[in-house]
């Protein structure tokens, strides 16, 4: 698998430098589709759903598509930040994450800095990530999340930071099935007949017998 990470402060800072901070929601939602569609379609959506001009949308796409090693991308982002405080804070946070995973023994080819990762939801405030299966990248992200400060403010006046993640169980199960990682059936029965009324047990037994005579493996429970 590959973890693709980014930081919302970097994205928000870059938008602020372009005078588009108040247009972050529609722009980031458009960027979130970059892995699923082509850049031209994303650019069209950005200009249609926000006040971004074609020139600004082109600049945004060029910024989020920087390439290289994690270290090289961070160096490029620092130059593009041009001293912008929030952007630099996001870049520094990404450095800490990358250094921390290295210290923890995580294979560095499993952690990729991807500035196009946006996580379209508004509440993310810091590091964000999406996880893809190397053998089945087309299945999409199977685990994603990030940091969100003060999301609990919806329910309490106390300011509380938070980090969350979600697993795509349906995608994981589909991937495991396609890769042959799921065990076969543990029971020979194809049908399970359940009953809750002991007084009608004979009726349920007759149903099971009729089904078995049709060649079906049935278990009564």
Language-model segment annotations:
Residues 13-18, 124-126:
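Short acidic, glycine/serine/threonine-rich loops at helix termini
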Residues 2-12, 31:
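Short, glycine/charge-rich beta-strand/loop segments that flank catalytic centers
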Residues 19-44, 133-135:
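Acidic, His- and aromatic-enriched active-site or binding-groove loops in soluble protein domains
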Residues 5-6, 34-38, 51-54:
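Short acidic alpha-helix initiation/capping motifs at coil-to-helix transition points
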Residues 1, 9, 43-221:
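Positively charged, Gly/Ser-enriched RNA/tRNA-binding surfaces
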Residues 12-15, 28, 98:
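Short, well-ordered alpha-helical packing segments
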């Amino acid at each position: 698998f590959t973890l693709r990470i980014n930081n919302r402060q970097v994205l928000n800072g870059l938008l602020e430098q372009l005078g588009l901070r108040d247009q972050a929601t529609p722009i980031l939602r458009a960027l979130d589709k970059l892995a699923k569609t082509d850049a031209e379609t994303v650019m069209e959506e950005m200009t249609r759903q926000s006040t971004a001009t074609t020139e600004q949308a082109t600049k945004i796409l060029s910024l989020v598509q920087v390439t290289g090693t994690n270290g090289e991308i961070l160096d490029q982002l620092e130059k593009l930040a041009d001293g912008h405080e929030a952007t630099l804070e996001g870049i520094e946070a990404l450095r800490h994450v990358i250094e921390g995973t290295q210290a923890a023994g995580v294979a560095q080819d499993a952690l990729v800095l991807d500035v196009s990762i946006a996580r379209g939801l508004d509440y993310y405030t810091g590091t964000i990530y999406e996880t893809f299966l190397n053998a089945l990248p087309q299945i999409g992200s199977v685990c994603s999340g990030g940091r969100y400060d003060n999301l609990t403010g919806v329910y309490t006046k106390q300011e509380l930071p938070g980090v969350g993640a979600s697993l795509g169980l349906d995608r994981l199960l589909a991937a495991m099935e396609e890769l042959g990682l799921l065990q076969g059936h543990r029971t020979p029965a194809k049908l399970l007949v359940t009953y809750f009324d002991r007084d009608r047990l004979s009726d349920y037994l007759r149903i099971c017998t009729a089904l078995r005579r049709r060649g079906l493996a049935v278990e009564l429970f």
